[in-house]
């Protein structure tokens, strides 16, 4: 890890809770002087679908047996360099430089069809925000890029050069829930160039008619453009759907989200696949079997202590569920 990459090491959110969830336990062992009691020594294959700087992965590795495997995914080239360094010192780690939306195909290329646990920490990481050159921050100057993977795809600046006002406004509204999307979109499209995040943030600030105290007026617009350019919500949907065939029965799914657009998707997915539904055709004499792919999901938020130590954790939610093999017939009232 380079000195620059070390400077961006950050605290993983809901660290203990997420790792315990993906291992299917209520809590990790308390650390004692007896090292033999400090690890669950879990065997199997696990996936950290968003490696970042490896906070969750490192704690998970401490709980895995020597014969276990941890596969880590990330789109960010810097994150991949950190992951590869970890893999060079721990043979249990395998690295995939790609989106977790490629989960099934990437695992198949390794000869893996099912895993024991899936974990993801969605959205943008603190190191990405704090590195102004990436373009994610409206508080630090940099190129208007915002790509998670800077080695491929179109930057936000390139997209803004060609997008029309209406499409931009729709993106700001749909992915940022920005109520003043049309006014802001018109102001953005009147800019002569898109080379500076601070310039872009200032234009949005001036165009925004109603500032919320304690919240920068460019917050939702930057979020919207980032989510759109990286297809974040589409990737989340693909990842969740792939979790059904990829997880073994008894395997664990644990996903951390930071805003309502992500959290709503996870919530609805788990609700849909954790309880039976009657068929849409009411004329059928009896409902067909409906697969129940997950147990009743649970949700956990950060503690007051974690929020105090890491204010960026305040909006985080961890949703978790266990993969089941239950196929059942919905009860019918006579």
From Swiss-Prot:
Keyword Lipid metabolism among record annotations: no
User: What InterPro entries does this protein's entry cite?
Assistant: RsmH, SAM-dep_MeTrfase_MraW_recog, SAM-dependent_MTases_sf
Catalytic reactions on record: cytidine(1402) in 16S rRNA + S-adenosyl-L-methionine = N(4)-methylcytidine(1402) in 16S rRNA + S-adenosyl-L-homocysteine + H(+)
Q: Where in the cell is it found?
A: Cytoplasm
Provide the residue span(s) of the region labelled Disordered. Answer: 272-318
**Which biological process annotations from GO are given for this protein?**
rRNA base methylation
One GO cellular component term: cytoplasm
Q: Which residue ranges have biased composition labelled Basic residues?
A: 289-301
Q: Which sites bind S-adenosyl-L-methionine?
A: 54-56, 74, 100, 121, 128
Where is this protein chiefly located?
A: cytoplasm
Q: What is its EC number?
A: 2.1.1.199
GO molecular function per UniProt? rRNA (cytosine-N4-)-methyltransferase activity
Q: Which UniProt keywords apply?
A: Cytoplasm, Methyltransferase, rRNA processing, S-adenosyl-L-methionine, Transferase
Q: One of this protein's Pfam families, by short name?
A: Methyltransf_5
Keyword rRNA processing assigned to the entry: answer is yes
Q: Could you tell me what this protein does?
A: Specifically methylates the N4 position of cytidine in position 1402 (C1402) of 16S rRNA.
The family annotation for this protein states: Belongs to the methyltransferase superfamily. RsmH family.
Q: What is this protein called?
A: Ribosomal RNA small subunit methyltransferase H
Gene name tied to this protein: rsmH
């Amino acid at each position: 890890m380079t000195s620059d990459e070390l400077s961006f090491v950050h605290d993983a959110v809901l660290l203990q809770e997420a790792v315990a969830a993906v291992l299917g336990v209520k809590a990790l062992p308390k650390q004692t002087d007896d090292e033999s009691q400090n690890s669950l020594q879990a065997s199997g294959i696990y996936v950290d679908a968003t490696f970042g700087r490896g906070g969750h992965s490192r704690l998970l590795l401490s709980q895995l047996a020597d014969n276990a495997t941890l596969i880590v995914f990330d789109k960010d080239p810097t994150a991949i360099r950190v992951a590869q360094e970890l893999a060079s010192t721990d043979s249990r780690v395998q690295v995939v430089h790609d989106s977790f939306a490629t989960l099934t195909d990437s695992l198949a290329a390794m000869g893996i069809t099912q895993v024991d646990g899936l974990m993801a920490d969605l959205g943008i990481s603190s190191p990405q925000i704090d590195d102004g050159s990436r373009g994610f921050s409206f508080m630090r100057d940099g190129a208007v890029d915002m790509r998670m993977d800077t080695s491929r795809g179109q930057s936000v600046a390139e997209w803004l050069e060609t997008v029309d006002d209406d499409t931009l406004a729709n993106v700001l509204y749909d992915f940022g829930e920005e109520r003043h999307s049309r006014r802001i979109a018109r102001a953005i499209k009147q800019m002569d160039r898109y080379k500076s995040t601070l310039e872009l943030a200032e234009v949005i600030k001036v165009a925004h008619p109603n500032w919320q105290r304690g919240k920068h007026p460019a917050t939702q617009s930057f979020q919207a453009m980032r989510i759109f350019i990286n297809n974040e919500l589409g990737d989340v949907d693909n990842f969740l759907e792939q979790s059904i065939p990829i997880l073994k029965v008894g395997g664990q799914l644990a996903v951390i989200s930071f805003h309502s657009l992500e959290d709503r998707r996870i919530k609805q997915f788990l609700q849909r696949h954790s309880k039976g539904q009657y068929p849409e055709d009411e004329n059928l004499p009896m409902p067909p079997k409906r697969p129940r792919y997950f147990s009743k999901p649970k949700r956990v938020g950060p503690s007051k202590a974690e929020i105090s130590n890491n204010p960026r954790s305040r909006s985080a939610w961890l949703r978790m569920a266990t993969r089941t093999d239950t196929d059942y017939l919905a009860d019918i009232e006579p």
